[in-house]
Amino acid sequence: MPAELTFVAPRRTPPPRHLADLDPQERRDAVAELGEKPFRARQLAQHYFGRLEADTARMTDLPAASRERLGEALLPQLLTPVKHVTCDNGMTRKTLWRAFDGVLVESVLMRYPDRVTLCVSSQAGCGMNCPFCATGQAGLTRNLSTAEIVDQVVSSARDLARGTVAGGPGRISNIVFMGMGEPLANYKRVLAAIRRITDPVPDGLGISQRGITVSTVGLVPAIEKLTAERMQVRLAVSLHAPDDELRDELVPVNHRWKVAEVLDAAWRYADTTGRRVSIEYALIRDINDQAWRADLLGRLVAGRLAHVNLIPLNPTPGSKWTASRPEVEREFVRRLRSHGVSVTVRDTRGREIDGACGQLAASGA
C-alpha cells in the first residue's frame, strides 16, 4: 500500500500579519488603515529589508508616536531563535526557531569562500513521507506563512551583517528552499516569499533570482505553474531513483506522478526559463547505487539542460539505510559522465549537527 501523503496542511490559527506578507501596495493600504501617511510604508520597508532592522525603537526617522503602533501592527515577532548549533569552525550554523504558536522549524546558514547560502524551511514538517528523510517521517504540522519564510532570511542576514557569524560581516548570496517541507505544496506563500527576497530594496531584499533554488519531490502541476511564472530561480528535483519501481518506495509521491512525468515537467521548466535543472539523487548503499541505475539515470538526463547532484545519504535516527561505499560512489559518477552528464557529489555541510539534507527535524529544543 502506498505511503500516506499530505498535500493540504492542517488548519491552524494563522500567524499575525507582518510587513513581509504584503506587497508594496498592500503595505501602503495597511499603513493608511492605521491612520499613518502611506509613505511610512516605504520607510518601514527600508528599515526591515534594507537595514535588516525589526525593532521600531531604532527607527528614529519615524515619529515616536507612530513607532509602537506600526511595530505592533506590521512587525510582530514571528520567529524566536531557540538555539544555534555550529560546525565547520563556525562556518555552518543551524538555527532552531520557535514560531508564535510554539511550532519549531530550522534553517541552516553555510559560509563558503565565494558565497553564503541559507537553507530555509517552507513548512513545519513535511507531508511527503519519504522514508529516508527525518523531516518527512515527522509528518506535516502546518505551512509557514510568507513572512515566516522571509524572516528566516532577514534574521540570518542581520546576524551575518553584524558579524555575529564566524568569518566576519557578510551578505547572503544564495537561498535554497531545501529545509523542512515540500516548497511547492505551499506554493502561494513560497512564491510570495521569493518575490520578497528578490524584489529590489526597499520592496524586498534584492537577492538575485538566479541565486534562489526551489526543490520539489515532483509535484507536476506546481512545477508547471512555476514554469509559467518565468522566473529565473533554479528548480531542483529530488529524484533519488531513475525507475518507478524503486522511486515508488523512496519517494511515495511517485505513485501520483511517475518519473517520466516529473522529468518531462522539469525539462519544460529548463526549456522555458533557460535555467539548468538540478537532479538531486541521494546515494543509498545497495538500494539505488547500482551501476545499471547510474546508466539509466544517465540516459534519462543526457542531452538535457540539467546537472546531477549526488548526495551521500545523511544518517537519520532509526534509519535502516546508509551512504554508498566510496568506490561505488566513484563508479556511479564515472558512469554518469560516460553519458555526457554533468555531475558533482555534494559537499555535505552540517552532518554533525543534524543540519544536512534530510536531517532537519526541529528536535532538541
Curated annotation (Swiss-Prot):
Main subcellular location of this protein, as a coarse class: cytoplasm
UniProt cofactor note: Binds 1 [4Fe-4S] cluster. The cluster is coordinated with 3 cysteines and an exchangeable S-adenosyl-L-methionine.
Gene Ontology MF annotations: 4 iron, 4 sulfur cluster binding; metal ion binding; rRNA (adenine(2503)-C2-)-methyltransferase activity; rRNA binding; tRNA (adenine(37)-C2)-methyltransferase activity; tRNA binding
Keyword annotations of the record: 4Fe-4S, Cytoplasm, Disulfide bond, Iron, Iron-sulfur, Metal-binding, Methyltransferase, rRNA processing, S-adenosyl-L-methionine, Transferase, tRNA processing
Subcellular location: Cytoplasm
Pfam family, one: RlmN_N
Cofactor(s) required, per the database record: [4Fe-4S] cluster
Protein name: Probable dual-specificity RNA methyltransferase RlmN
Native species: Thermobifida fusca (strain YX)
